[in-house]
Every structure is written in C-alpha cells, then in structure tokens.
Amino acid sequence: MIRARQSVQEIKEYVAGKNVEEVAASYGIDEKSIIKLASNESCLGASPLAIEAIRKAACDAHVYPSVDAIELREALAMRHGVPVRNIVCGNGMDAVIETLLRAFLETGDEVVIPLPAFSYYENVTRFCGATPKYCARRADFSLDVDAVLKQVTDRTKFIFITSPNNPTGNLTSLAEIRSVANAVDGIVFVDEAYIDFSGGKTALELMKECDNIVIGRTMSKAWGLAGMRIGYGFMPDWIFREYMKVATPFALSRIAIAAALAALKDEEHYNRTVETVKAERQFLMENVPFKVYPSEANFVLIDTAPLTSKHVVTEAMKRGVILRDCASFREMGDRYVRITVGTREQNVRLVEVLAEIKGSR
C-alpha cells in the first residue's frame, strides 16, 4: 500500500475552533442565538463596499484572475509604501508561509518556533521535511531572545516571530526582532496578522536595514475578509525571486481580489473596526471574571484556573457562546482560553456566561 511521506505522517491535523453549526447540532441550540468568539473574525464584518464588489465580481466567476494578483499588489504597494516587486499575495497568510518554506526548506533544515504559537508553523515545517525547534517564551509570554538564539544552528533556515502573538496577544518590540535578525543567517518571518489592532510599530521599517526579514499580513482580521482567504507578504528582492518560482498561479480568485480592492478603499470601515476592537478589548480586560492577559490583538487570553479550559469552553458552548480552548496549542496546557473581541452586546453576554460558569464550580 502506498503511504504518505514520513514527514506528513508525523503531522498532527490542524484543529480549528468549533463553528456555529456544530455547536447548534451538539447542544440543540438555535443557530441565531449562538455567538462565535473563537476564530478572531471581525466583530463588524466586511465593508459594505467589499460585499457589493463580491456580488459584481461573481458575474465573471468563469474568467481566470490575474496570475499574480498584480492589481491587489499595486494597491497594497500604494498603501504601505513598499515596491510591488517586494509584495506577494496568497490564499490566506497560511499559503504565503507554505510557499515561502517550500522555496527554501530542504530535508535536515531546522525552523525555530517560540512557543506558544500558531500550530501551522510546525505543520508546514514538517511537510517540507524540516525539523521544528522549540523555545519557550517567558512567563508573561514575552519573547526570550536569548532562548531563541540558543536554538539556532548552522541548519536553521527560518525563525518565526508573531507580533502580536497568537494566542497570547502580546507584541514583540522592533529592538527584539532586530536583535534576532542581525544574529542569524536564516530568514526571520514576522507574522503581523493582528498588527492593525496594536499600538506598536510594524516591522516594515526593519526591512530597510535587515535583508533577511519577511513580514506576513492578512485581510482576515481588521478588514473582515476571513472568508475570502487573502494573505500577503513583504520580502526583499532576493527572497521574492525564489518565492515566485514556486508560487501557485492564480492563487487569489477574481472575487477575492475584487473584495480586497474595495475594502482598501473603505478607510472609514477599517478605522471603525479597529477602534471598536480597542474599546471592547478594554471592556473585556476590565470585566471578564478570570485573569486576563494584556493584549494588542482582536482577542484576549484568559487563565481559567482552577477550572480547566475544556470545562469552561464546554460550559460556554452549552450556553451558546463559542470560545477557543488553547489546549491544542503546543505547551499551553489545560488552563487557557482565547476569546475573540466581539460587539458590546456580545461581550456583555460573554461576561455573564463566564461569571455563571465560575460561580457554579
């Protein structure tokens, strides 16, 4: 019998958060009464301009999109002040990461991943035949640069730094990112999926002084287009050239490109989304009846001790609130839950549900 590659057999399937349909079926709850605060989706949804663009673009669904999403890359170049030749687009940031690693990793290479972190980094590393090397963040989940550098060897090809980090929500300073980039020969991938919600600076300015930094972005969060799967990345010329050799052609659909272009024109909706998240995040920080870690993202992390994360998440689902159990994140244990920032109405209900769960133990 033919078997999958050994490196694939070693991969654990990605575990996503529960969706509304699953919870409704499992607990006999009306779908309309369920609030999903598990997947870090936009609490205000997509821009009306993007929704209208999707409707119009659907009429041309039979026509191939541009091979490399050039029109979107040009729009992103204008927004961020980065040359088009240094921007790539993919079917979600996951695809950008996979393409990048596919271009550079070989069997025997190593990838350094500070934990806790998004599990897909590990999966795509193993898929490419490389070995993930882990290091722990500090007790407050800040990046330990010394711990990162201790894992670096002459086989290290990539180092992942997520800022703000998922699932902990904290930023990594530009000074820390610079320290890592200057100390290694490998590529430092800075995942900035949640940077829009932070008060910190993007690592874009570091690309002017470090030619081994790649920055990943997404339109799933602040732009409210998670269902369109639109990711993009900034990278220096020498990395871009190799990336494009293995990039999937026509990776973004015409509909996704149209939605992204329209969303980028709706600055008012974007700003309203970011400001709403910041205000509601503060509401959660002040009112959730468990320890809440400081966050610069559109989610907060809570410590459910002495209750287990599984207990809290299960009891919340029974009450129609979907949260993310962080036990699926390597080294997170069984006491952390990630909560997406919702609307005020959703957040008030969430706080009431958590108080009820905590009070009934």
Curated annotation (Swiss-Prot):
GO terms for biological process: L-histidine biosynthetic process. Pathway: Amino-acid biosynthesis; L-histidine biosynthesis; L-histidine from 5-phospho-alpha-D-ribose 1-diphosphate: step 7/9. Keywords: Amino-acid biosynthesis, Aminotransferase, Histidine biosynthesis, Pyridoxal phosphate, Transferase. Gene3D superfamilies: Aspartate Aminotransferase, domain 1 (3.90.1150.10), Type I PLP-dependent aspartate aminotransferase-like (Major domain) (3.40.640.10). The modification N6-(pyridoxal phosphate)lysine is found at K221. Its cofactor is pyridoxal 5'-phosphate. Transmembrane segments: none annotated. InterPro entries: Aminotrans_II_pyridoxalP_BS (IPR001917), Aminotransferase_I/II_large (IPR004839), HisP_aminotrans (IPR005861), PyrdxlP-dep_Trfase (IPR015424), PyrdxlP-dep_Trfase_major (IPR015421), PyrdxlP-dep_Trfase_small (IPR015422). Belongs to the class-II pyridoxal-phosphate-dependent aminotransferase family. Histidinol-phosphate aminotransferase subfamily. This is Histidinol-phosphate aminotransferase.
